[in-house]
Amino acid sequence: MIKSRTAIKRLSPAHTSAKGGGILQAFLKKYPWSILAAGAAIQILTGVPSAWGVFQKAVCETYELAEADAAMIFSFVICFFGIGCILGGLLQDKAGPRAAGLSGAVLLGGGFCMAGWLVPAGIPWAFYLAFSVPVGLGCAFLYPSVMSCAQKWYAEKKGLATGVIGGAVGLSGAVLTWLGRFLIARVGIRGAFLWLGALMFAVCAAACALLENPQGKAAAAAAQGAAQNYTVGQMLKTKQYWLLFFVVALATPAVLLFSPIIVELAQQRGLSEAAALSCIVVGSAASAAGRLLMPWLSDKIGRRYTDMLLFAALAGLSIWFAFAQGWLVIAVYSLLTFCYSGEAAVIPAAVTDLFGQKNAGVNYGFAALGMSLGSVGFPLAARFLGLEAGRHWLAVGAAAAGLVCLVFLKPTQGKRL
């Protein structure tokens, strides 16, 4: 009887799960870089906003949409990314990063497949619902799951973890641009969406199998990052949260107002179509460099000073971009993507430094709501002011305002930020 009970215990799901979890924990402790590799594999396929310019023309033609309507597809993806960071953060804190990541893989792949299969031509809102909502939510479920998990395994090197994962996000624009051009030329935009959806689901779901928070000594090390771990309610009552929220919002127009139309804009300013498309590839490489280098710099001089340098650069470069012609369009746009992506890559570590590691996933989600506000609010404001000039001067003013917010952003717990 005793042997029988022992056998049953060994075969029970809980015992099997614990044993499997122990094997995975042992593997991750021995090879912590595998978390970064899995995260990079996921994020290299989630930089949809960076690559949207390669899809925009084909979407306008095949789905019979005006340029402004197609650009709003991009804006709503960013909007629902911010909203999804909260939902994904809550799911991650309750069920762990693997569950949140797998949910994101389903949403991301499903959104692309629905756009390729179900969306009729001439109905913008159908595209927003079938593509923008699930893709934005899917990217959001994946990003904080990967980022928070990596930061916990690399608690003493958060900048390194943030940089590696962020670098993959930056390279994603180049990867998706190449895949998009290759597939659109062979199977059209609908077929391209279907193939990309299947690829994204397969790769992201497989990589999510490695996402697991550390236990034991690694977990204890991750918990030492802050004297206090703020709940969402506590965080929302701080001045630091609202300043950070507006910092995130005010960074958006410098790049996100131009990403959907960068190919057309470069052609209008004297570049051939092939040269104009290189804006996306070179911009993606610059984005990857910014996401890799700026978190490293923030480990050295602090998150706040790093972002202050980047916002000052965004303001100056936005003025230059308003007058850039020819090859200077590529050069200045690439510098803008470097600064914007570098700033964005520092934010997760800043949230952790300000409000603690325990609730980092959902707390980052609330900070990312600033991106939702900026991604919809600034395009609407640009339309009101006049799209061409309005985009540029909104970018300049927003970057200057973001710099002012950073001047007043102070640590929450007496430590350097």
What does each of the following model-derived ranges do?
Residues 281-287, 292-293, 298-350:
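C-terminal transmembrane helical hairpin of 12-TM major facilitator-type secondary transporters
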Residues 106-120, 313-325:
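C-terminal ends and interior cores of transmembrane alpha-helices
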Residues 213-230, 417:
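Flexible cytoplasmic inter-helical loops of multi-pass small-molecule transporters
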Residues 124-140, 249, 328-341:
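Hydrophobic core of transmembrane alpha-helices in multi-pass small-molecule transporters
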Residues 141-154, 161-162, 342-355:
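Intracellular juxtamembrane helix-capping segments at the cytosolic ends
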Residues 168-212:
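Helix-loop-helix hairpin linking two adjacent transmembrane segments in secondary transporters
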Residues 52-59, 239-289, 294:
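Extracytoplasmic gate region of multi-pass secondary transporters
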Residues 84-97, 291-302:
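Helix-to-loop junctions at the C-terminal end of transmembrane segments
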